[in-house]
UniProtKB/Swiss-Prot annotation:
Part of the 30S ribosomal subunit. Contacts protein S5. The interaction surface between S4 and S5 is involved in control of translational fidelity. One of its GO terms (molecular function) is structural constituent of ribosome. This is Small ribosomal subunit protein uS4c. It comes from Atropa belladonna (Belladonna). PROSITE patterns: RIBOSOMAL_S4, S4. InterPro entries: Ribosomal_uS4 (IPR022801), Ribosomal_uS4_bac-type (IPR005709), Ribosomal_uS4_CS (IPR018079), Ribosomal_uS4_N (IPR001912), S4_RNA-bd (IPR002942), S4_RNA-bd_sf (IPR036986). Residues 89-149 form the S4 RNA-binding domain. The lineage of its organism: Eukaryota, Viridiplantae, Streptophyta, Embryophyta, Tracheophyta. Keywords: Chloroplast, Plastid, Ribonucleoprotein, Ribosomal protein, RNA-binding, rRNA-binding. The gene is rps4.
Length: 201
């Protein structure tokens, strides 16, 4: 299944706020109206919707998300927590959380178009897994910095998660550590996602 490129508001109206996909928010009460129309949800549908939230927020294909679930299952610790850490440490998500891109699709475009350096080298793979002490900077070109400046100027200036540090005037971000689960940028029940995939991994 390919990456979703359809109307974004349609998705947030059904699944709730997905800040990685779009900075728009569903209208107040729309979730309640949707629930009342659809009646009681089955357990399968509840798990499916949590999985869809994760997939659309991080901008993943079905195959990519399944791959991350399989990696998380083999790692030590809670599968759900490891899964969220893997997704949060992707380069496209780190750029988004730093405010250097307005959404994860916008961050992916920056990376694909070779505007981003990691530790002084161009990285053009959005799924690149960032590590503690990684230094993320804009390429030293006017166009690259201008694109990031637009995002920095329009970002809501929310508190940065404690695993990241931003130096906006240098167009630079630092990865201090692996993210703590309480700083994940999405309201999600990751256990339901793991349960959804339990028969496929």
């Amino acid at each position: 299944m390919s990456r979703y490129r359809g109307p974004r508001f349609k998705k947030i109206r059904r699944l709730g706020a997905l800040p990685g996909l779009t900075n728009k928010k569903p209208r107040t009460g729309s979730d309640l109206r949707n629930q009342s129309r659809s009646g009681k949800k089955s357990q399968y549908r509840i798990r499916l919707e949590e999985k869809q939230k994760l997939r659309f927020h991080y901008g993943l294909t079905e195959r990519q998300l399944l791959k991350y679930v399989r990696i998380a299952r083999k790692a030590k610790g809670s599968t759900g927590q490891v899964l969220l850490q893997l997704l949060e440490m992707r380069l496209d998500n780190i750029l988004f959380r730093l405010g250097m891109a307005s959404t994860i699709p916008a961050a992916r475009q920056l990376v694909n178009h070779r505007h981003i350096l990691v530790n002084g080298r161009i990285v053009d793979i959005p799924s690149y897994r960032c590590k503690p002490r990684d230094i993320i900077t804009a390429k030293d070109e006017q166009k690259s910095r201008a694109l990031i400046q637009i995002s920095l100027d329009s970002s809501p200036h929310e508190e940065l998660p404690n695993h990241l540090t931003l130096h906006p005037f240098q167009y630079k971000g630092l990865v201090n550590q692996i993210i703590d689960s309480k700083w994940v940028g999405l309201k999600i029940n990751e256990l339901l996602v793991v349960e959804y995939y339990s028969r496929q991994t």
